[in-house]
């Protein structure tokens, strides 16, 4: 027992450092997801078709978001280690790489949405009821997409700045910026969706406008603070004096980071493909999944952000050449993440059924959403472990391994299982959803052996 405690349980100083880093990130994402939840409810009050149209577009935006995260994360592997080593010029080059990569992804996404937005939305619409509801949902989805695209550029810029700021251990400012953004989003949503006084009722368009405005507010706060506090953000020294970076630097980040960039993109595309597989069971399934996903995201933030902290803390130890400290911290953080998420899963099981009742939709959709939430709660602790394993491998620059662990697993195991069960079996959609989610158990075994092998204990800078 003593050996177990020594290996997997830290002292007060360890948890204080970990939580000081994690709590602002958890709060930031909690507020963001809470406002997304409120936004979802407000759109849901307009009707099932409006809610479904917006939900489908948000699936497409989800792929874009993850592609941007992948682009900036590729350089973040080096950024955390550069900062740990005190190499501010290297940190500056990683920032440039992030900015260029995020804007390139944005340009590609906007081109796709403009030229083929209707086709992409239609992939998720199957009119099993024969009442024409899918055409209405398509119209609302197109309206929402055309406006929300305007907010993609500030989102890309924010990610480049915020990730670099976090790599220096300053998680408070991105949190404040996020508070301002989501707070304004909530207020603007209420005003523009329903219309108050002289402000007209804009419905779905109002939700999109509110999202775009909040994106710009967040960007302005993050960028202005970073440039006004250059002594704390030394990577900005000379960041805009030129546009290039040493070829060797670019090559190193690109080669190491490409699997990570592709991983985020393919994983997100895989998850949306799984949703598309479910959608053949009808619009009610999409609506139920939308409600369940919104609720689940509120609870998932704990393991997502605890995992992200692993990459920062372990990355800094690796950059400083303290490999044993990196391994020790990683063991303790993984156990802590799984424990916290087991508690969150229990809470989610107890209260998850109350949330769908808030929505203005059918009893069938509410029942589906409740069942989906329960399944997600059961699987959550396993997701916490695999997520922590992923960030452990990533902190040591094992991007090809993470690509195999995440994206290849999704496309080789998860997508085929979802496709076959949804399209070629008579199983109920809840049973299908459970079996697809249960594939995470295979990933747990793979993640355990990968982390245990210490293949990730590498100093790259």
Regions flagged by a language model, labelled:
Residues 1-22, 79-151, 199-258, 314-379, ...:
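Short alpha-helical transmembrane segments in multi-pass integral membrane proteins
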Residues 30, 34-52, 121-135, 191-202, ...:
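Helix-terminus/linker motif at the lipid-water interface of multi-pass membrane proteins
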Residues 72, 76, 147-166, 174-185, ...:
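Short runs within selected transmembrane alpha-helices of multi-pass transporters and secretion channels
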Residues 25, 29, 41, 58, ...:
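Transmembrane alpha-helix boundary and packing residues in multipass membrane permease domains
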Residues 48-59, 141, 145, 208, ...:
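Small-residue hotspots at the loop-to-helix junctions and early N-terminal turns
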Residues 20-39, 147, 181, 214-218, ...:
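Transmembrane helical elements of multi-pass membrane transporters/channels
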Residues 51-114, 155-174, 286-352, 383-405:
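Small-residue-rich hydrophobic transmembrane alpha-helices
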Residues 26, 30, 34, 38, ...:
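Generic alpha-helical transmembrane segments of integral inner-membrane proteins
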